[in-house]
Amino acid sequence: MTDMTRRNVLKASAAGAGAALVPTAWTAVARAGSQAPPQALAAGDLALWYDEAAGTDWLRALPIGNGRLGAMVFGNVDTERLQLNEDTIWAGGPYDSANSRGAANLAEIRRRVFADQWSQAQDLINQTMMGTPGGQLAYQPVGNLRLALGAASGVSQYTRTLDLTTATVTTTYLQNGVRYTREVFASAPDQVIVLRLTADRANSITFNATFDSPQRTTGSSPDAATIALDGISGNMEGVTGSVRFLALAHAVTTGGTVSSSGGTLRVSGATSVTVLVSIGSSYVNYRTVNGDYQGAARTRLNAARTVGIDQLRSRHLADYQALFDRVRINLGRTAAADQPTDVRIAQHASANDPQFSALLFQYGRYLLISSSRPGTQPANLQGIWNDSMTPPWDSKYTINANLPMNYWPADTTNLSECFRPVFDMVRDLSVTGARVAQAQYGAGGWVTHHNTDGWRGASVVDGPLWGMWQTGGAWLASLIWEHYLFTGDVEFLRTNYPALKGAAQFFLDTLVTHPTLGYLVTNPSNSPELAHHTDVSVCAGPTMDNQILRDLLDAAARASEVVGVDATFRAQARATRDRLPPMRVGSRGNIQEWLADWIEPERTHRHVSHLYGLHPSNQITRRGTPQLYEAARRTLELRGDDGTGWSLAWKINFWARLEDAARAHKLVRDLVRTDRLAPNMFDLHPPFQIDGNFGATSGIAEMLLQSHNGELHLLPALPTAWPTGQVSGLRGRGGYTVGVAWSSGQADEIVVRADRDGTLRLRARLFTGAFTVTDVSDGSTPATTRPETDVVQLTVRSGRTYRAARPGVTPTPTVTPTTPAPPTTPPTTPPTTPPTTSPPAPSGARATYRVTNSWSGGFQGEVTVTAGTTAIRGWTVTWTFANGQVVNQVWSGVHSQSGANVTVRNADYNGALPAGGATTFGFIATVNGSTNNPPTNLTCTTT
Ligand code: FUC
């Protein structure tokens, strides 16, 4: 595939990225009588497999990784090629991206935007707000390790497999009567890539191995069984390349001989060989590049040399499977799975292949485990896999869709730990972004625009049409709260609170009052990458910014309460949030993308940013905001289904949230086409961009379980194409691990394990018929209520598992969570308040309830429990309309305690209020398992 430099891509984007970038799709033809090989069957079909080698096609090679080290494995008979990456090898070196001309020109830029002089505003942004340099730097490869194994003649029974259950690529074939097998895996515990070659006839393995690289490198042979590649990253954008790296490959043989000289490793007549690859980098962090890269490479290699292959393999498996095995999924299998993976993709449009959806789902989880681990860099636009010095969009971090999308499946598919690199990056950005905030806006806090790189560039890049977007850092910082909703980890929140606060502080300092509408708005900003008039995207207060800022300011305020600090800041954050522009329905019945009802010149643009409120956020919901919900559907109809890989993936998530199973599944199918999925299942923008893989995994999870609305909604968008199946180990906000088994499109059995005490609200079609609920831990039947026909509510206890099932359904072992909750999950919230055995109740007599704050988009309530309560162990607040319909349920928010008084605050209702005057709402608080039912009525007046 042709490499795409940033500038080429920008030219293409200017012309409308979709059309300009589409390559010719590849093809693959069905094999008559094909059957899945034993390795794929042993993996329960969770394997990519092929009957041909990758040749020179990088998009046929198979990825392995341990978060830091990555390799693409080609599996050619004559030459094995491992294309190597290390996740800190970035072009250039530390730089300060802030442009000191910005702040002095900001007032004039804003004036031009408010005067609708968008083009003139963009000109001034070009002159004064662009980063230094005006583009960011690229993630670059280490090079290749090639094993020249001899001619490929006389070969039969060739297969190549990437087993997702073992994170191992295996290549095996028969050549001249000898069965050769190669296994490759990247070990996180031992920090090496392991290539194991075996043959079933003694002394049959002979090869020469060498490194090569597009970087500036020197090869050598440091000892008789090792070769080395010492290099430095490339110069770019006027910044001198400064990341030094050392790659070592060392052979351990049984039988035969091994020698190394002049950078060539020679193995002759061996019976088995283990090649260990170790890579060290001098990158310490975004501002320091003087690490002992040679020492790091050698130390890891020497340590791995003392470990035999069996132990290397078993440690790798234990480490990997502890993550991967948390989620099991079965969507059914047809004979389509007996074709090689590339054939399955090529035939997908005409085949019934439900297992491919399961494979795609698990591949995303595999890729996240392999590219993002505690202590590594976050997964970039290509995860960690890149063979080019000038990769598309620099293989960096694009924040206006791609980087957040990479992490959508992290919590929902039970890979909480894999999320951590993002929070490390956010803390870095809170430093580099603070300089940009000061220099370009004269503001406190920190800001990051639409991209960042290994050096944590935070300024405007690429040009105003793309780069002049203020809310990149805001989106990333809001993920801190989102992650907390899953884990309940107060220590995590405390550690990351300063970055969250700083992101909010920037907007408290910079939002400006719209001259005619009176709302507080960002200016200048854009609705990502979409021109509202020809060639201009810059505007004030685009809808996505307002949605992101509602989440950010809420998150910062709520976090400040959990952490117990900053009351003044909190009040300011809330007051500011209340003055953000509400979402509006435009003339076409759509969600308006900008403050004005403009019609975008490019109607089918890939970004649908203004539906951020539908997904990933929860500001547009079916039951909470019915009008906006319908407008969201209309918005998607107007934009159409087509788009880049990541755009399709986001649309799976959108349609899942719209509970439209057929459409969500159509989008899954649209993604599984040869122009959107490479033979190795890498998602194609095109070109390759990994966000589509992660977005697809997230979308499939959203089709099976949603938890954004204060309840666990089971099978909200189950397509007819998956009539029977099971999934287990999915995670829901509030700290739940969930399994479900279904047949005929309906749940037979739901199993939920609670991390914390609380009130569990389950929504499923199952509850419209006969069902039973059991506390699996002791076989008892917990008390339940039925707030809606398809909703069951019950009090749950930390560590216990609950099962709801149709009467007579035999428990399905695979839907019961088998692995413990992620280690980051704390027992209760907050840890400073020890659980108590007395179950005091916030009954109507003991509690007072009042609306504390209201605004056009919602309001907050407060319940104060004044007698008999010693501690809160779990609580929820439910808002209902006067007719009893539940409109919102809240688990997040804050409670505090002073003596015997317990206060639950900020139990926000975030839906739309019916227009005009006063609306009566019911406010139901459940604290320590008791509830004030019937609800206390509160009246809210729309302002
Ligand atoms: C944004 C998108 C492009 C591409 C790039 C990396 O600019 O609009 O489609 O995904 O990021």
Where are the model-predicted features located?
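Solvent-exposed beta-hairpin/edge-strand motifs
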Residues: 762-778, 878-891
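Aromatic-residue-lined binding/catalytic grooves and analogous aromatic/hydrophobic interfacial grooves
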Residues: 36-465, 482-484, 515, 562-565, ...
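Extracellular low-complexity, O-glycosylation-prone Ser/Thr/Pro/Gly-rich "stalks"
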Residues: 840-943
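N-terminal export signals
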Residues: 2, 8-28
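Ser/Thr/Gly/Pro-rich low-complexity, disordered linker/stalk segments of secreted
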Residues: 810-841
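C-terminal capping/lid segments that line or modulate ligand- or cofactor-binding pockets
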Residues: 61-84, 88, 108, 128-129, ...
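Carbohydrate-binding surface patches
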Residues: 188-195, 199-200, 735-761, 861, ...
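Surface-exposed beta-strand/loop patches in extracellular or lumenal glycoproteins
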Residues: 205-213, 753-767, 871-882
